[in-house]
């Protein structure tokens, strides 16, 4: 009886630990995190989520939002294709920027993000 309980408990613990070590988030979750970091004006997180070649562009985009208040509305992203080893991700929703009471909306569906998984984690590496 003790042996059966021990085996069942060990199996249960193994299954629980396997659930906790799922693979890294997909490219769509990385793009969502990237856009959230942009909205929250988190340059450190934005850099972490960007490829080295895209980082300067990402930080330039961030600079363009520094003087305005932003909100992110209706964000959902999905992988819509591939380009070689890269994933193509499109998003729905918008960034609404407010400056001196004037609102400007940036439609997120106007761009397709390019995500790359060359380091074991998905990173945003461009947009088209």
Task: Describe these PLM feature segments.
Residues 1-5:
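Positively charged n-region of N-terminal signal peptides that target proteins for export
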Residues 11-12:
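Repetitive helical segments and hydrophobic/amphipathic motifs
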Residues 15-18:
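C-terminal motif of bacterial Sec signal peptides marking the signal peptidase cleavage site
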Residues 20-22:
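Bacterial signal peptide processing site
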Residues 24-31, 39, 104, 108:
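Solvent-exposed, acidic/flexible segments
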Residues 34, 38-46:
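Short helix-adjacent coil turns
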Residues 81-128:
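Exposed beta-sheet edge and beta->alpha loop/turn motif
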């Amino acid at each position: 009886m003790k042996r059966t309980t021990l085996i069942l408990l060990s199996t249960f613990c193994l299954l629980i630990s396997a659930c906790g070590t799922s693979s890294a988030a997909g490219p769509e979750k990385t793009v969502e995190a990237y856009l959230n970091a942009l909205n929250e004006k988190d340059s450190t997180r934005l850099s972490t989520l960007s490829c080295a070649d895209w980082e300067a562009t990402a930080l330039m985009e961030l600079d363009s939002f520094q003087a305005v208040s932003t909100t992110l509305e209706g964000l959902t992203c999905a992988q819509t294709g591939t380009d070689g080893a890269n994933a193509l991700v499109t998003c729905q929703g918008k960034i609404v920027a407010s400056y001196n009471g004037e609102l400007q909306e940036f439609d997120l569906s106007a761009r397709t993000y390019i995500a790359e998984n060359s380091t074991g984690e998905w990173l945003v590496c461009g947009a088209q």
